[in-house]
Amino acid sequence: MNQENNKNKISIIGHTKGIGKAIADISKLEVVGLSRSNGYDLSSDIETIMNKLDDCQYIVVNAYAGNNQLELLKRIYNKYQYENKKVAVITSTSGTPQGEDEEFGNATYKEYCQHKKDLIKYIEDIQQELIKKPLSIFDICPDVVDTEMTEGMWDHWPKLKAEEVAECVWLCFEKPYNINKIVIQKNAN
């Protein structure tokens, strides 16, 4: 792969709504969008998605599909650890002890929290290895974001805008150093 060809491309897994769309909207790069809406389902097409990442220096793992977000990240790490790529992974404060809403007893939410915990732990575990490698992986960990996914939920909490999360992704991508983790929370006005 020619490293010069990939400098102007960003792949966003989950690019049509919410945070992924906000990242695509502010991108000055060619966007390689990979979502269910255009035939790339993270639940069943990990190999196909991986093949689309070769030509992209920037990758955003945004789409949530159970444990497949983690499986995709593991494959990205194994394949690209010796390449100069930057990967932003959208995790969630729901995957942290402080962020999980204990009062929200929905089984789907509990499963979501566990998958995000596993994802955050994996990113933490590989950070020491990444110091000696050209690959950068950023844990972008927002609190509640005002998107279709959170409609009608946590309305009593201040919500981040998807654009605010997108700005943090670009902050990480533009820096010459690795920002291991960025936690974003909206304060009440």
Predicted regions and their residues:
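Structural signature of the Rossmann-like NAD(P)-dependent dehydrogenase/reductase core
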Residues: 12-13, 60-62, 86-92, 136-141
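A glycine-rich helix->loop->beta "capping" turn
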Residues: 35, 49-61, 85, 178
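N-terminal Rossmann NAD(P)H-binding glycine-rich loop of SDR-like oxidoreductase domains
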Residues: 8-28
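Short-chain dehydrogenase/reductase
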Residues: 73-77, 122-124, 166
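C-terminal helical subdomain
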Residues: 139-140, 154-189
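Adenosine-cofactor binding site in Rossmann-like domains, unifying the SAM/SAH pocket
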Residues: 30-51, 64-67, 71
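Catalytic loop of short-chain dehydrogenase/reductase
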Residues: 68, 81-131, 143-144
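Short, flexible catalytic-loop segment of classical short-chain dehydrogenase/reductase
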Residues: 142-152
